[in-house]
């Protein structure tokens, strides 16, 4: 028994030992794995760090101090055309000239252990690391500052073009840690502080403390007192926030005043000033003068007046183009690298960037000359507030690439930062909007074709009310005051017929017009989006400009693609690295087929429509197309168009109602485009395969019949372009043939002798118009009207007179006069009488010499 027990105990101990061995083995494996991972991580981290360090740039203090060359601007051929005009001011100072209070103020607020560390502050880094860990866990932005003044100097002068992503920041931080001690060993603290104080941006125009002393207090650096030193030292953290003349500071100066107090508190904390000095300084800040005066152009800091920087009046060589290009570069730096405004400003002023624009210098120069010296504009020229009138703008774009080639923002000599009408104006587009929001929208959505016929006549009451304000009756007018009657889309666009555009927009829907307009790059406010006058006729509330319109019209030559406008191709940093680069980005706005049809339609105004004056100024064999536009009272005059090379827009501001029209804008456009293509080979835009040519009837927009060729105005058959699948399938139903009395033109009837009758072709109308229409004389005459067609065209455009000549309904009763040569033979109204009705001849009235017949009914199918 005892032996068995011992055996069991022995076996149990062995089992326990085995379990312990297994646990130890598992622990050993885990420990080895953990250590291995740590080692691998450390090795990897060291490797990455060494790799980052290896790519660190070489630096020396002389290059850092001199690293303030302004960025350069180049044209599309790589020729230097401008240098960044620095609004900044720099007054270099020596270390020994700087007040001790100013140095101590910067050290206290920016790097309190500056004179103790060797370039990096380990204690500060550790504190920042803990904060970063908390921020990462909580999802807040990580990477606290912890930068010493030495690191800031390196960052501001060496790494200014590096990105602001997390990876970029980590890389830059490692390189700063490596370079900072290296720099301190080479030059020492005084040289580093001097370089820092001379290169730091301090708001307004001030680069460096010398310029800041002059700008804010109008004193030299050695004359700054304690409060002034504290104010200047508080600026670097965020010069735009603490700048006294920012919008926020004008309303609430407490931001920069409280920042100054913070600097003073840190100076006291670090033992640089005494308690009494601190209290005295606060007292100076807390006087009644520390609030904004009634004059918001003057800011104060306690008892001190803070001077406002004077404006820079230096102009760029190519002011109209260079400034928009720089603004685009600024926007992209902010979007891509998340740079602050202050960082971008410093980079442009000191970064020695190379900005390659899309500007064609020769075209820019020639276009400015053409606009400045235009004979018609100069004949009307007057000077208002030292500004030549009328003003104008123009833009040319290579729509294939999106590269903007010309921007002209005004006429005549104008100052720096003058209002750029090409990029900043917001004016009504007039009829130049129609190809974008009406005709393209209708054709691309296949709700209409280039042959679609509508009646050019006053809006029906229901349609008018839909777009009228309560209690009003909106009726758009055509420019010539004439209504055409049946009208096709091609002719409506060619002659800029307003009523047709409104009716077509109503057919496709206002929202459709808005949607297409936005795809073309237009922007609408809520007023515009609900206004037929805005979307169909261009009476925009928000407005547009030549920059937008020039790029929009490029769609018609680019297979329906809208190329995002580009003002620069690339930006290089001082080391030749690509900082920014643009590529052609295009989006499909309309189909290639719709685009080509629109391009073909837009040749109409130039050849025989509203823009024929362009033929006197454009002499190239390269095709040109486009559309005029004018807003109410001819305040804004437009021509927007394209060739197979460029699209463009010209706008003339007729502010004072002078004798100038959209045709003058077309003539000006012709001069500009003539110069643009004069040395280019002849070229045409190719027609896509998805387009079909088909013969149609111009009056109905349908397939022609024999009567289409016999219209009294001549054959109404022509060849039109259609997107495949949109060719009409129905035959013309507007033309009719009937017999008429040769002598009075009225429809002959059963009593009209055959020798007095002849067959004629007419058009028929579904309903009568309240006003005369141009094609009334070709409408099938009613039985009850005497020379009704002719009488309508002998109108004087008076509404009351016009209404007396309206045709009556076919079922109305009436009497007819006999032909002068057939006194005893009354005329029937038609030879298509309803066979169920009888007509009866009554005795003639000798006195009135008239023959009266019974009422007749005209079958509806004939009308």
Swiss-Prot record:
Residues 71-248 are annotated as: Transglycosylase. Coiled coil: none annotated. Gene3D superfamilies: Biosynthetic peptidoglycan transglycosylase-like, DD-peptidase/beta-lactamase superfamily. Pathway: Cell wall biogenesis; peptidoglycan biosynthesis. It catalyses: [GlcNAc-(1->4)-Mur2Ac(oyl-L-Ala-gamma-D-Glu-L-Lys-D-Ala-D-Ala)](n)-di-trans,octa-cis-undecaprenyl diphosphate + beta-D-GlcNAc-(1->4)-Mur2Ac(oyl-L-Ala-gamma-D-Glu-L-Lys-D-Ala-D-Ala)-di-trans,octa-cis-undecaprenyl diphosphate = [GlcNAc-(1->4)-Mur2Ac(oyl-L-Ala-gamma-D-Glu-L-Lys-D-Ala-D-Ala)](n+1)-di-trans,octa-cis-undecaprenyl diphosphate + di-trans,octa-cis-undecaprenyl diphosphate + H(+); Preferential cleavage: (Ac)2-L-Lys-D-Ala-|-D-Ala. Also transpeptidation of peptidyl-alanyl moieties that are N-acyl substituents of D-alanine. The keyword rRNA-binding does not apply. Residues 774-863 are annotated as: Disordered. The chain crosses the membrane at residues 29-49. GO terms for biological process: cell wall organization; peptidoglycan biosynthetic process; proteolysis; regulation of cell shape; response to antibiotic. Residues 847-863 have a biased composition (Basic residues). The keyword Nucleotidyltransferase does not apply. Its main location: membrane. Residues 392-674 are annotated as: Transpeptidase. It is a single-pass type II membrane protein. GO terms for cellular component: outer membrane-bounded periplasmic space; plasma membrane. Its EC number is 2.4.99.28, 3.4.16.4. Signal peptide: none annotated. One of its GO terms (molecular function) is penicillin binding. Residues 50-863 are extracellular. It is found in: Cell membrane. The active site is at 110 (proton donor), 431 (acyl-ester intermediate). Keywords: Antibiotic resistance, Carboxypeptidase, Cell membrane, Cell shape, Cell wall biogenesis/degradation, Glycosyltransferase, Hydrolase, Membrane, Multifunctional enzyme, Peptidoglycan synthesis, Protease, Signal-anchor, Transferase, Transmembrane, Transmembrane helix. In the N-terminal section; belongs to the glycosyltransferase 51 family. Cell wall formation. Synthesis of cross-linked peptidoglycan from the lipid intermediates. The enzyme has a penicillin-insensitive transglycosylase N-terminal domain (formation of linear glycan strands) and a penicillin-sensitive transpeptidase C-terminal domain (cross-linking of the peptide subunits). This is Penicillin-binding protein 1A. The gene is pbpA.
């Amino acid at each position: 028994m005892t032996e068995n027990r011992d055996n069991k105990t022995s076996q149990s101990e062995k089992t326990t030992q085995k379990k312990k061995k297994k646990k130890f083995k598992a622990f050993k494996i885990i420990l080895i794995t953990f250590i291995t991972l740590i080692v691998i991580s450390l090795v990897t981290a060291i490797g990455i760090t060494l790799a980052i360090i290896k790519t660190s740039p070489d630096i020396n203090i002389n290059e850092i101090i001199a690293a303030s060359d302004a960025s350069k601007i180049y044209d599309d051929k790589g020729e230097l055309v401008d240098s960044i005009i620095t609004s900044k001011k720099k007054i270099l100072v020596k270390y020994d000239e700087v007040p001790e209070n100013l140095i101590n103020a910067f050290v206290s607020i920016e790097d309190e252990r500056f004179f103790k560390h060797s370039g990096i502050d380990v204690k500060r880094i550790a504190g920042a690391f803990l904060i970063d860990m908390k921020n990462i866990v909580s999802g807040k932005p990580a990477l606290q500052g912890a930068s010493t003044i030495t690191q800031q100097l390196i960052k501001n002068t060496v790494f200014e073009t590096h990105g602001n992503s997390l990876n970029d920041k980590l890389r830059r931080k490692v390189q700063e840690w490596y370079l900072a001690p290296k720099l301190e060993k080479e030059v020492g603290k005084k040289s580093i502080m001097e370089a820092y104080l001379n290169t730091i941006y301090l708001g307004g125009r001030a680069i460096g403390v010398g310029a800041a002393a002059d700008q804010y207090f109008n004193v030299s650096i050695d004359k700054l007192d304690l409060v002034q030193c504290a104010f200047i030292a508080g600026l670097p953290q965020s010069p735009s926030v603490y700048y006294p003349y920012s919008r926020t500071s004008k309303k609430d100066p407490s931001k920069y005043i409280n920042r100054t107090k913070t600097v003073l508190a840190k100076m006291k904390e670090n033992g640089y000033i005494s308690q009494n000095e601190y209290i005295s300084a606060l007292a100076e800040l807390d006087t009644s003068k520390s609030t904004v005066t009634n004059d918001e152009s003057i800011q104060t800091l306690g008892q001190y007046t803070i001077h406002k920087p004077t404006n820079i009046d230096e102009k760029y060589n190519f002011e109209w183009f260079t400034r928009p290009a720089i603004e685009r570069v600024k926007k992209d730096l902010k979007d891509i690298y998340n740079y602050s405004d202050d960082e971008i400003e410093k980079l442009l002023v000191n970064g020695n960037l190379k900005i390659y624009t899309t500007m064609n210098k020769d075209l820019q120069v020639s276009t400015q000359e053409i606009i400045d010296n235009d004979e018609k504009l100069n004949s009307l020229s007057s000077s208002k507030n030292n500004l030549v009138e009328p003003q104008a703008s123009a833009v040319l774009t290579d729509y294939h690439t999106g590269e903007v080639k010309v921007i002209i923002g005004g006429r005549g000599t104008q100052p720096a930062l003058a209002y750029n009408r090409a990029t900043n104006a917001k004016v009504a587009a007039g009829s130049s909007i129609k190809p974008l929001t009406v005709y393209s929208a209708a054709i691309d959505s296949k709700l209409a074709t280039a042959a679609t016929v509508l009646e050019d006549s006053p809006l029906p009451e229901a349609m008018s009310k839909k777009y009228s304000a309560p209690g009003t009756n909106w009726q758009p007018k055509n420019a010539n005051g004439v209504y055409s009657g049946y009208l096709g889309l091609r002719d409506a666009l060619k002659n800029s017929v307003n009523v047709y555009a409104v009716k077509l927009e109503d057919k496709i829907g206002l929202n459709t017009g808005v949607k297409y307009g936005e795809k073309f790059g237009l922007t609408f406010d809520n007023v515009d989006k609900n206004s037929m006058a805005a979307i169909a006729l261009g009476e925009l509330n928000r407005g547009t400009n030549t920059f937008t319109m020039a790029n929009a019209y490029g769609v018609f030559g680019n297979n329906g693609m809208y190329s995002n406008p580009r003002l620069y191709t690339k930006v290089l940093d001082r080391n030749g690295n690509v900082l920014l680069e643009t590529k052609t980005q295009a989006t499909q706005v309309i189909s290639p087929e719709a685009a080509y049809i629109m391009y073909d339609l837009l040749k109409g105004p130039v050849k025989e429509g509203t823009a024929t004056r362009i033929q006197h100024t454009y002499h190239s064999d390269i095709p040109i197309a486009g559309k005029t536009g004018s807003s109410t009272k001819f305040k804004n005059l437009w021509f927007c168009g394209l060739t197979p090379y460029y699209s463009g827009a010209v706008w003339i501001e007729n502010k004072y109602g002078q004798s100038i029209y959209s045709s003058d804008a077309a003539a000006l456009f012709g001069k500009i485009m003539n110069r643009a293509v004069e040395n280019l080979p002849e070229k045409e835009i190719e027609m896509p395969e998805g387009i079909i040519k088909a013969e149609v009837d111009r009056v109905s927009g349908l397939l022609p019949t024999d009567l289409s060729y016999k219209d009294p105005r001549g054959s109404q058959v022509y060849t039109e372009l259609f997107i495949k699948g949109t060719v009409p399938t129905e035959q013309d139903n507007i033309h009719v043939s009937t017999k008429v009395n040769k002598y009075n033109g009225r429809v002959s009837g059963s009593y009209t002798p055959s020798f007095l009758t002849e067959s004629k072709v007419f058009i028929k109308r579904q309903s009568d118009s309240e006003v005369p229409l141009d094609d009334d004389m070709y409408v099938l005459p009613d039985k009850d009207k005497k020379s009704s067609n002719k009488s309508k065209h002998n109108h004087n455009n008076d509404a009351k007179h016009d209404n007396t000549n309206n045709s009556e309904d076919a079922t109305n009763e009436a009497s007819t006069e006999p032909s002068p040569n057939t006194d005893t033979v009354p005329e029937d109204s038609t030879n298509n009488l309803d066979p169920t009705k009888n007509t009866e001849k009554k005795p003639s009235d000798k006195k009135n010499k008239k023959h009266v017949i019974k009422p007749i009914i005209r079958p509806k199918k004939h009308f």
